[in-house]
A protein has these predicted regions:
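Periplasmic c-type cytochrome electron-transfer domains
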Residues: 1-263
């Protein structure tokens, strides 16, 4: 379940002081060091131009290309946005939800770097339409919802993009903050912020220089920066380098959005 890692009690992050490794063997762990789970708040916002701490999931920037970049062999077509793509990625990653290959997991790829079998997401779709021992559809409510939302109601018509788009719409509705004291203040309600909060805003947007990086509606430029703090761990996290392979991107990380940071 998504909520196993995106914990509601921790504002959809993991709430951990230190990152933890997933329970798979070393062979199937990615080269990227363990990281804390990113939260889901306001990820539908138009300012969100990348996903994950190193921006591995992003729109194609080249002018002669269209679509979205994925590090896995998963087609980006018909997914509505980055959040829709990211919603299904954990399902096809061995170190997250897919698991290691074995007798009980025939859907996992045979080796690291091998293409993800297309049957993985097809199997997820089919589970929504399976019948129980009495011949009754266990996912009847899902069938009704897919029929209502997309005009489809049988497994053969449901595509992985339908799953991703549905999850993204839920995240958009469930985890958004559009009516905060800050929003009301910007809209003209000068009483929405306390005197201390106003002084903090002046510092944040003024001499403190915070807004140089923490800018926009959700307080992030979504750029990649190094704050100069050394990584003391044995397995150092090279950040943006894992997405681009460029030496100059070593130790750069995406600016985390500060909207709702106190949750």
């Amino acid at each position: 379940a998504c909520a196993s890692c995106h914990v509601l009690a921790s504002a959809t992050a993991d709430g951990a002081a230190l990152e933890t490794r997933l329970d798979v063997s070393q062979e199937w762990l990615p080269e990227v060091p363990a990281r804390n789970v990113p939260d889901l708040w306001n990820r539908d916002h138009n300012d969100v131009s990348t996903m994950l701490w190193d921006g591995r999931l992003q729109p194609v920037a080249a002018s002669d290309q269209v679509g979205l970049v994925l590090p896995e062999s998963l087609s980006a077509t018909v997914f509505e946005n980055l959040m829709a793509l990211q919603s299904v990625r954990p399902i096809v990653i061995p170190a997250e939800m897919l698991g290691e290959p074995g007798a009980a997991n025939a859907l996992a790829p045979e080796a690291r770097g091998a293409p993800i079998p297309e049957g993985v997401l097809a199997r997820v779709v089919s589970r929504l339409f399976e019948v129980d021992a009495r011949g009754q559809a266990e996912g009847e409510s899902y069938r009704a919802l897919f029929r209502e939302s997309y005009g489809i109601g049988v497994a053969d018509e449901v595509r992985p993009a339908h799953l991703g788009n549905a999850l993204a719409h839920y995240i958009e509705i469930a985890f958004q903050s559009r009516d905060t004291p800050w929003d009301r203040y910007l809209a003209g309600d000068l009483s929405a912020l306390s005197a201390d909060q106003k002084r903090g805003a002046l510092l944040f947007h003024g001499i403190g220089g915070c807004a140089v990086c923490y800018a926009g509606d959700i307080f992030s430029d979504f750029g990649f920066h190094s704050v100069g703090v050394p990584d003391i761990r044995e397995n150092k996290d090279l950040g943006r380098f894992y997405a681009t392979g460029m030496a100059e991107d070593r130790f750069l990380f995406r600016t985390p959005p500060l909207r709702n940071a106190t949750l």
